[in-house]
Amino acid sequence: MSGGLFYNPFLRPNKGLLKKPDKEYLRLIPKCFQTPGAAGVVDVRGPQPPLCFYQDSLTVVGGDEDGKGMWWRQRAQEGTARPEADTHGSPLDFHVYDILETVYTHEKCAVIPSDKQGYVVPCGIVIKLLGRRKADGASVCVNVFGQQAYFYASAPQGLDVEFAVLSALKASTFDRRTPCRVSVEKVTRRSIMGYGNHAGDYHKITLSHPNSVCHVATWLQDKHGCRIFEANVDATRRFVLDNDFVTFGWYSCRRAIPRLQHRDSYAELEYDCEVGDLSVRREDSSWPSYQALAFDIECLGEEGFPTATNEADLILQISCVLWSTGEEAGRYRRILLTLGTCEDIEGVEVYEFPSELDMLYAFFQLIRDLSVEIVTGYNVANFDWPYILDRARHIYSINPASLGKIRAGGVCEVRRPHDAGKGFLRANTKVRITGLIPIDMYAVCRDKLSLSDYKLDTVARHLLGAKKEDVHYKEIPRLFAAGPEGRRRLGMYCVQDSALVMDLLNHFVIHVEVAEIAKIAHIPCRRVLDDGQQIRVFSCLLAAAQKENFILPMPSASDRDGYQGATVIQPLSGFYNSPVLVVDFASLYPSIIQAHNLCYSTMITPGEEHRLAGLRPGEDYESFRLTGGVYHFVKKHVHESFLASLLTSWLAKRKAIKKLLAACEDPRQRTILDKQQLAIKCTCNAVYGFTGVANGLFPCLSIAETVTLQGRTMLERAKAFVEALSPANLQALAPSPDAWAPLNPEGQLRVIYGDTDSLFIECRGFSESETLRFAEALAAHTTRSLFVAPISLEAEKTFSCLMLITKKRYVGVLTDGKTLMKGVELVRKTACKFVQTRCRRVLDLVLADARVKEAASLLSHRPFQESFTQGLPVGFLPVIDILNQAYTDLREGRVPMGELCFSTELSRKLSAYKSTQMPHLAVYQKFVERNEELPQIHDRIQYVFVEPKGGVKGARKTEMAEDPAYAERHGVPVAVDHYFDKLLQGAANILQCLFDNNSGAALSVLQNFTARPPF
C-alpha cells in the first residue's frame, strides 16, 4: 500500500468516521508518522475502537458480543465461515486437543439445560473439551457436566469424617464465598505403598469445587491425623482416568445439546452434554486440520535493547505464518501486522495499523477468530510472549485472557523462574494460554540438537540448509522511520523468521510427538513440554493402580530422604591406540525394575519383616542392603509390580508399533507411528527418575537406590566376567568353527571405564576387524551368563582410538571414521577463533596421524616427568610444530585481527557494574574518551589484547584490551605472548590425558618444548 493512501485517524481525526463507544483507549503513535525520521512517540487518548487498514480499506478490528471481529468477517466474505449447529440435541463426532477444568455456580442455571442444573448447585465442575467437529472441521467447545473431584482418607477410629470435612469448609474463607457440595462414602481400597496391604475401608470425599480439595485434605491430616490419598489429582485427570478417555483423539457424543446463547467460548460451535454421553474412538488415529501459527515480533529500542515496560519501546511488526496440519509443509499463509504504511511484500498479506494498541488487539483476535490451536516461535517463551503480554497489561491495561478462546476464567500468562534474570535465553520459562498448545522451537532444538550455538540462523543452516537474512536490532529504528520501503524490508525479515520456525516445526513434527506423549501419559498436550516427566509417570501409575483398586498416598517427609546415586567404574585415563569396544545395557533402569519386580506395592521396608511370613528368600523375594537398612521386594509370581507391568505393556506396544511402522507406506501414518514409539520410549525412560526425585509427585528413594545399586553390581559383574575371557573363549563364540579366522592368542580384554549403563573395553592386541567380529557375540555371551530377562547387553560402538580424559569426558574416532566427543569442550566457547582452530588442528593430528598416535599412547603410559628427562617421542613433534608455527604466525602478523577477537555482552549500564575492571568495559570507556558511537545494552563488545605501553610485563587484561578496529587502523601490535599462552592452555586441556591426566603437567611440558623465538 502506498503511503499516500494511508492516513492516521488519531493524528488527523475524522470525527464523522465512526460512532464513538463509551470506552477510552490510550494509543502510543510513533512521531515519525508526522515527521519522517523523528524518534519518540505521541500519547493520544480517545474513544475510537481499534482500527486496521487492509487493501485501501479501513475496518474495525473488534466485533460484536459473539466476538466476530475483522478476521471472522473476512472469513465470512471468503465463504470459509462455519455453519451454525442444529437447534436440537443430536449425535456429535469431534476431535479433542485440549481439556480444561472450570467451575459453574448456581447463577449459571438460567443459561444451561434444565437436566444439567443439578450438577452446579451450589457449584459444580464443568470440563471443557476443545477441538474440531468431524463433519466440517469447525472449532468446537463441548461443556461436560457430571465430573467430580475427590480424594481418599484413612481416618482414626471414631472420627466423624463428614463432620470434620464440613468443619474444614466452614473454616475456609473461600467456601463462605462459594459454598461447596460434599459427599463422603466408605469404599474398599488398598494402599499401593508396601507389600501385604489388605483391602480396607477408606473414605472417599467428593467436593463440587476443586479448589476445596487441598484445604480439606490438609485440615484432615493436620487436625485429625488422617492419612490422605490422591489429593493431588485434579478433576481433568479424574475425567480422563475414571472414564478411560483420551487427552488427544476422537470422541463421540450421543446427545450434544447446542448452546446458541450465553456461550462460554469463542469456538464456532458450542455444546452441552454429560459425562455418560461420551465415548472414545481409539481405533482412529487420524487428525483433523488443526491450525498452527508461527509468529515473531520486531521491537523498537529507544535506548538500546527493547524493554517492554518502556512506553517508547513499541512492537513495530508481528509476523504470523499459518499452516493447517492437514496441508503439505510449506503451504503457508503469510501475514504481516505492521505499524504505519508498508510497501507490498510478495506472497504476504500486509495489515497496517495506526498504533500499537490496534495491532495488539488484532493479534490476539487473530489467534482466537482464526481458530489457532498450536502456537510456535523461536525463543518466544523468553522474549516474544513476555514482551507482548507485558505491553498489553502494563502499557494498555488489556487483559489478554479476555481475548482468548474462553470468555471467562481463561489463563494467559508467562511463568518466569526465580533465576530468570541470570542469563538471557537460559531460563526455563513456561507459557500458559487457555486453549493453545505452546511450542517454543528454541527449546526443542536445544533438546534435540548438539550445536555450538542455537541461534535461528545456525539451526536453519544445519537442518534446512537455509540462510537467514539478519537485521540487527540497531537497524530497526532506522528502517522503520525510513517509511513504507524500510518497513517492507523489516517486514520481509520478520515474516522470514516465522516461516523458518514453521519449517522447523515440520522438520521435527514436534506437534505429533507432543500429541502422542499426551495420549500415553493421560495429560493435556499443553502440559507435555513444560511440566516435565513426573506428571507423565504419575498419571500412568494412577491409571494402573485404579484398575486394581489401589490408591496412592500423598508423599510424606520420610519419603524424601537422600540416597547414593549412580556411580561409575573410574576411568583409566589415557590415550588408547587399540580398539575400544563399548557395550551398553539396553534400557538399563527400566529392565532392572522389570527383572527384579521393583515397585511401591512389592516392597517390604525394615521393621516390616513380619510381612515375609510364608515367603521363601531367593525364591519368593529378593533382599537389598540400602542406606536405610535391608529392603525386600517380592517376586512377580507373588505380586506383580505396577511399574514393571507398565513397562512391559509399553514395550510390547512399542514393539508392535515398530512392526507396523516397518510395513507402513503412507507418509503421514508413518510419522504418527514413529512418534508413538518415540513417546513410549521417552515415558519408559522416565520411570526410574520418577521414583528418585525427592520433591516429586510420588517419590520412593528406596526403589531408586535399589535400581542404582543393581546397576553398579551389574557393571562390576560384567567387568570381572569380560576381563576373565581369553582369546580362546572368544574364539569359541564363533557361530561355527570355521566362521572366524583365528584370533590373536596374545589379545587381552580390559575394562577401562564404566559409565552408568556402559562398559568401555580395551581390546589390546586385537585388530579392529577382530574386535568388530566378536563384539556382538561377546555382548550376547555376557548377557546369557550373568543376567535374567529383560536385562541385555548390546555392542553399541567401537573406537579405533580413544582419548579418555575423566568420567563422562572422552574423544575418539569410531570405526566408520567419525569423531565422537562426549563432555569435551575443545576450548571455551568464549575463546578466540585463533585458539579454537589451532586446538582443533592439534586434536585432529593426534587422532589421525599414525606416528602421532603411537607417540601419544607411549606418553600416556609413562610418568609425565620422563618427558623432561627423556624428551618427547619423535612421533609427537608434529604437535609441537603446529604450536611453534602458530607462534611464528602471531609474531609476523599473519593472523587476521578477526581471529584474535573476544566479545562480551554489555549486560547493563556501565554505572550498574560493581567493578569496571573487565576488558569489554575498558574498551567501552575508550569509546567514550574517543567520542565514538557507544554500544547499547545487550550489545556484544569486541576486543583484542595488545602489547601494553612500554612492554610492561604483568600488565592487567583491562590495560591490554583494545577495540579491534582501532588496533588494526593504527597498527597497534597484539599481545603475542598472551595469545600464545591461551593457545598452550587450550592444547593442554585437550592433551592432559597424555600427561598423568593433569592439565598443569601438560602445560608445563608444552611450555618446555615449544620454542619462542627471541625478540
Curated annotation (Swiss-Prot):
Major localization class: host cell
GO molecular function: 3'-5'-DNA exonuclease activity; DNA binding; DNA-directed DNA polymerase activity; nucleotide binding
Domain of life according to the entry: Viruses
EC top class, as a word: transferase
Transmembrane spans: none
Cysteine-cysteine disulfides: none
GO CC terms in record: host cell nucleus
Alphabetized SMART domains for the sequence: POLBc (SM00486)
SUPFAM superfamilies: DNA/RNA polymerases, Ribonuclease H-like
Recorded catalytic activity of this chain's protein: DNA(n) + a 2'-deoxyribonucleoside 5'-triphosphate = DNA(n+1) + diphosphate
Gene3D superfamilies: DNA polymerase family B, C-terminal domain, DNA Polymerase, chain B, domain 1, Helix hairpin bin, Palm domain of DNA polymerase, Ribonuclease H-like superfamily/Ribonuclease H
EC number annotated for this UniProt entry: 2.7.7.7
Keywords, alphabetical: DNA replication, DNA-binding, DNA-directed DNA polymerase, Host nucleus, Nucleotidyltransferase, Transferase, Viral DNA replication
Compartments reported by the entry: Host nucleus
Pfam assignment, any one: DNA_pol_B
Record's keyword annotation contains Magnesium: no
GO BP: any one term: DNA replication proofreading
UniProt similarity note: Belongs to the DNA polymerase type-B family.
Subunit note: Forms a complex with the major DNA-binding protein BALF2, the DNA polymerase processivity factor BMRF1, and the alkaline exonuclease BGLF5. Interacts with the putative helicase-primase complex composed of BBLF4, BSLF1 and BBLF2/3 proteins; these interactions may coordinate leading and lagging strand DNA synthesis at the replication fork.
Function: Replicates viral genomic DNA in the late phase of lytic infection, producing long concatemeric DNA. The replication complex is composed of six viral proteins: the DNA polymerase, processivity factor, primase, primase-associated factor, helicase, and ssDNA-binding protein.
Listed name of the protein: DNA polymerase catalytic subunit
Species this chain originates from: Epstein-Barr virus (strain AG876)
